[in-house]
Every structure is written in C-alpha cells, then in structure tokens.
Amino acid sequence: MYGPKDHGWIEVVAGPMYSGKTEELIRRIRRAEIAKQKVQVFKPEIDNRYSKQDVVSHAGDKIQSVPVRSSKEILEKLLDDTDVIGIDEAQFFDDSLVEIVSKIANNNRRVICAGLDMDFKGEPFGPMPKLMAIAEFVDKIQAVCMVCNNPATRTQRLINGKPAKKSDPVVLIGAQESYEARCRKCHRVPK
C-alpha cells in the first residue's frame, strides 16, 4: 500500500475469521521492513491463542509484537523513530483506539489495523466500524463459507457443534467454542 509522501495515514484490513487479515498485516509489515522502515506491531494482551508475544496467523506466519492491555498503552510504548505501526485484533480494543490511531497518523506515520469487522452475531465489532470510516485505505476481505463454499463475510461461533445464541457474550476468553467462516445465507444466530 502506497500513500502520500510526508503524510501519515490509516489502513484497515477487515473481514471474518480465516480470511487472512493477520497474514495481510504481516505481509505489509514485512514489506515495510524490507524498505528499511522502523516498524512496531501491537496486539491486545488477551489474544494469547498461539503466542503471548507474537502476532501469529492461522497459517503459522508470525511477527514479533508488543502485547498491550489498552489502546492508551500503545501510545506509551510507541517508540519515537517508528515509521509503521501494526495493530492486530483491533476489535478487542476500546473505542479510544480510534482517537489514538488518528493521533499517530497525524504525526506522519502509517498505521495498519487488522480485525474482525463483525462479531459472531453479525453486528459491528468494537472500534472497527469507526476505524474503517476514518481510514484512507480499507480492504474488506472474505474467507470461504464452510457450508456452501461461497464467499464468507461472517464468523460463525459454534459451541459443541451448534451455533452460539444471540444472548451469548461477544467475547469468550479460553472457552470451548470454535469458529467457522460463513456466508450471509449460511450464518445462523438463534435467539
């Protein structure tokens, strides 16, 4: 992704689980490193599925990151000479991430955010809708529906093989749920 010279900007990579959001974030960060740009990658501390320290894609690609408890901590840990900032699992951050990302971009830095645009209910997730609104570049990518093989834009949460209910909590840490990519037609959220 190429942006204006001597200006900061925001990029968002959004989509359902298994669409390659983290792989795309890692790819963009690696390209910046090849170009000798200073990079820093942040992720929410609660994302410890594959690694506590690294951002790891489902395919196993990984890149070193700084786990943070809140979006405010990104500013505290951001180094002065960083050119490109990556933020994975942006949906798990609080709404102040939008203001923080804007502040960073306004200081002539490139910010790349990756995350789920919708929760398992098919509703906008965390700060992602606002990030997509203020970003200069937005890529909404799809996975493949596990039921019908059409393009998937939603994440289906399954508990013991059955769709999670609308009343279930949006974020479940360490629970025995699983996820599948689904298209609009095959996505189910029972009441």
Swiss-Prot record:
<keyword id="KW-0418">Kinase</keyword>
<keyword id="KW-0862">Zinc</keyword>
<keyword id="KW-0479">Metal-binding</keyword>
<feature type="active site" description="Proton acceptor">
    <location>
        <position position="89"/>
    </location>
</feature>
<dbReference type="GO" id="GO:0071897">
    <property type="term" value="P:DNA biosynthetic process"/>
</dbReference>
<protein>
    <recommendedName>
        <fullName>Thymidine kinase</fullName>
        <ecNumber>2.7.1.21</ecNumber>
    </recommendedName>
</protein>
<dbReference type="GO" id="GO:0046104">
    <property type="term" value="P:thymidine metabolic process"/>
</dbReference>
<keyword id="KW-0547">Nucleotide-binding</keyword>
<keyword id="KW-0067">ATP-binding</keyword>
<feature type="binding site">
    <location>
        <position position="148"/>
    </location>
    <ligand>
        <name>Zn(2+)</name>
    </ligand>
</feature>
<dbReference type="GO" id="GO:0004797">
    <property type="term" value="F:thymidine kinase activity"/>
</dbReference>
<feature type="binding site">
    <location>
        <position position="183"/>
    </location>
    <ligand>
        <name>Zn(2+)</name>
    </ligand>
</feature>
<keyword id="KW-0237">DNA synthesis</keyword>
<dbReference type="GO" id="GO:0005524">
    <property type="term" value="F:ATP binding"/>
</dbReference>
<keyword id="KW-0808">Transferase</keyword>
<dbReference type="GO" id="GO:0008270">
    <property type="term" value="F:zinc ion binding"/>
</dbReference>
<keyword id="KW-0963">Cytoplasm</keyword>
<dbReference type="InterPro" id="IPR001267">
    <property type="entry name" value="Thymidine_kinase"/>
</dbReference>
<dbReference type="Pfam" id="PF00265">
    <property type="entry name" value="TK"/>
</dbReference>
<feature type="binding site">
    <location>
        <begin position="15"/>
        <end position="22"/>
    </location>
    <ligand>
        <name>ATP</name>
    </ligand>
</feature>
<feature type="binding site">
    <location>
        <position position="186"/>
    </location>
    <ligand>
        <name>Zn(2+)</name>
    </ligand>
</feature>
<comment type="similarity">
    <text>Belongs to the thymidine kinase family.</text>
</comment>
<feature type="binding site">
    <location>
        <position position="145"/>
    </location>
    <ligand>
        <name>Zn(2+)</name>
    </ligand>
</feature>
<dbReference type="GO" id="GO:0005829">
    <property type="term" value="C:cytosol"/>
</dbReference>
<dbReference type="InterPro" id="IPR027417">
    <property type="entry name" value="P-loop_NTPase"/>
</dbReference>
<dbReference type="InterPro" id="IPR020633">
    <property type="entry name" value="Thymidine_kinase_CS"/>
</dbReference>
<comment type="subunit">
    <text>Homotetramer.</text>
</comment>
<feature type="binding site">
    <location>
        <begin position="88"/>
        <end position="91"/>
    </location>
    <ligand>
        <name>ATP</name>
    </ligand>
</feature>
